[in-house]
Amino acid sequence: MIHNGSTPRRFVFGNNDANERIVPEEYKYNSSMINELIKQNKDLHKQVTEKQEEIDRLNVLIGSFRAKLIKYTELNKKMQRDQQEQQHNRHQSFESKPRYKAEFTSESSSPVSNERDSEYLQIKKNNRHDENKIDDIYQKLELLTNLVNDAIHKQNNGEQREPSNFNSRIVSDDDIIISESQEFKQLQDQIDLLKRKLLIKKENELRKLSLNKELADLMDELSMNSSPSANQNIDPYSELSSRPKSGQQRRTNEDQQSLHCEHCHLKSHTQSHPSEPRFVNLKESLETPTPTPTQTPRKLKREKDTNVADKQYSLW
């Protein structure tokens, strides 16, 4: 049953794994770190605003206390000035009057009237002195107020700059994380490239060694095949045709012994005097004569005997 105002749920039939994407662990870790940093940023912003409100309240209290302090200092200075003026007037009144009158007035209650008279007589002088003092006081107060205002402005500017510096520091942390992940990826790519190059280099070296080995084997076989072919070219065909079968067998045995001796002599010579590597034309050496249909059975038999000798020579 669907209630009013509620939306029906959608059910997806089939394999849910196909709809989900595989997210690497690095991205998950980075997202969790970013969420934590955002949360810390919000908490710190709250703390900063609370501290700012406290600072504003304290600034208000400081301003009120400062005004009271200025007021009381002015009252204190005024009272001090009044006392100094009274003392000065008394001293002048005592000096201006005769001795007997001063002695009489000191014991009686007439000093108040004398002070008033002295003040009345010296109004201009006292007013000038007071005006100078007041001007000095006002100048000092202006200097103090300017200094206090400058200090307050500097403090407020510093407090306003702290959140901006904090925000920039947070942004710089995110940038550092992203840059580090990019650097790691670049290093991984470089390592994979170097591994690939090393594998290719090793494969080329192995291939080069195998080809050199095959070339050396072919050269050895060609050198071994060239020596019996030279001996066969020296023997004339007339002697082979005139001799009987027993003579041919004797000659094959002698050829085998001579080939064995030559092989031993060649081996000892190569062991005592290693020769330089020979460069043979592979195309010319691989070209073997093919039997033509005009050859006689005697020639075919002779070539068969030479092939048997070559095989025995290779076995030796």
From Swiss-Prot:
Domain of life: Eukaryota
Keywords: Coiled coil, Cytoplasm, Cytoskeleton, Nucleus
UniProt xrefs under InterPro entries: Spc42
Matches recorded under Pfam families: Spc42p (PF11544)
Subcellular location: Nucleus; Cytoplasm, Cytoskeleton, Microtubule organizing center, Spindle pole body
Major location category of this protein: nucleus
Disordered: annotated span: 78-118, 224-257, 281-316
Composition skew (Basic and acidic residues), residue ranges: 78-104
GO cellular component terms listed in the entry, alphabetical order: cytoplasm; nucleus; spindle pole body
Plastid among keywords: no
Any coiled-coil regions, as ranges: 32-223
Family: Belongs to the SPC42 family.
Protein role: Forms a polymeric layer at the periphery of the spindle pole body (SPB) central plaque which has an essential function during SPB duplication and may facilitate attachment of the SPB to the nuclear membrane.
Name of protein: Spindle pole body component SPC42
Species: Kluyveromyces lactis (strain ATCC 8585 / CBS 2359 / DSM 70799 / NBRC 1267 / NRRL Y-1140 / WM37) (Yeast)
